[in-house]
Amino acid sequence: MGQHRSQATLFLLSGIVLLYVVVFSGLAMARYNTFHASTFDLGIMTQVVWNTAYGRWFETSIDRATNVELIGSYLGNHVRPILVGLSLLYRLWPDPRLLLVLQSVALGAAAFPLYWIAHRQTDDPKAALIVACCYLVYPALGFLNLVDFHPIALSIPLLYMAYWALLEGRMTLFWVAVLLALFTKEEMVVPIGTWGLVNLLKRDKRCVGIGLLTMAVVWTILCYGVIVPYFNDGQPYRFFQLWSHLPGFSKSSVQGGTAQPLAEASPETVILFLVHLALPLGFLPLLGPASLVVALPTLTYLLSGSRPAFHSVGYQYPAVLIPWFFLAVSEGLQRLRRKASRHGGLRFYRLGLVFLLIGTIGANVPLNPVLLYAQAGAFQPDPYHDQIVEALAQIPPETGVAVVNRLGPPLANRRVLVVLEYPSPLRLDHVQMADYVLLDLVDCRTVPALDPRAEYANIVTQVLQTGRFRVRYWSGRILLLERGTPSEKELAAVLDYVADLVEQKRSCWP
């Protein structure tokens, strides 16, 4: 009877996972199709995967470590060997939407090993189903799935698989999953190393702990001491500057810029971030300290970092926290279940499940990613959608293009793609390597300046005044330039249009 119930529950979970994958794949592609995705980061990942697929391993013109040469190696910024595996699939369907679908499939499929873990720890298939379903509607997971593509999202199913394999004693699968998780991003050394320390404290898991620590230390040395400096002109990991305000971090020891403005987290921001993480879980991770402690170093460096996105569930950064929080939930339920069996009552165990359900449902009222994205119009075409399509149709494949952030993803399958807003200051010599320039003359949301409207007008003016580009297509706010001798009358009209936007103090969006 128990086995039949477990099979029925697993069958139900399969249907729910399939629904999740279909819905989130569709929404992610709708966001892409309506030009609401971003070159940072979907365009970056697409270009790196496309280049790698055709033998130019980790080559990028968008997210290189320095602003000296236009084309460089992505390995000077981040170390993500898992992109090599994705590049093999990309040859079958060379389209950014492949990455979006793969991400949805991976995040949805992660519910299965989480279910197996919770089932094993609680011996309760219904509770395991609740945990898996709460994972699928966890707000931070939904935002992660919708905000472009990030390889670190793949670490979630891999870590669940590793944890389950360790419980089952399937050590080959365990080590393979851990290694692949490390390959999703260099920062994975933090939770893997911490997990190793936790296992060192368990008498029967000390060998596992030593192995995890060894892998984390070796990968740390390779990433931060060898690979990144080698591809970054001998300079250290440039994102260390996000913690340069802390003791021990010298501002002179870091180099390069970041695509987002910097700001330390206020106490209110920290509290709100923690509530957004913990409330949907009914605060149950507090009952699973063995897994919760693995998340604490990552949580600490996110809270102490000076990038505002670090302190929000609306971006990809909580991806490193999500698996450990849900593993702590499962461990917490296991603890409540054991206490219930010893004291002859299931009241607190059931109360824990109620807290989890209420927290999940309650948090999704104000913080549902699908509803928030829909309210922002992220799945609907803008009134000038057809103009963007018409402009894109006039750009030949693999020609060099300079573009604004939101219009870059469909153009990422090319070696030369220059994003005009970043890195700052604008390198006109890089822009002049492009054959086309595609602009939304209104959208200045991602310009890193105190007055983005004026700075964006300055960028457009600089591009036009190079004298290298003429108007190929102009309809309303969408402008396509191509290499050639410009018409002074057309350029003057564009400059007047941009100047009027500044004079009117036109908002960057919509």
Ranges and model annotations:
Residues L88, P96-T122, M161:
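Transmembrane-helix motifs of polytopic, lipid-linked glycan transferases
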Residues M1-G26, H119, P125, C207, ...:
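Start-transfer (signal-anchor) and selected internal transmembrane alpha helices
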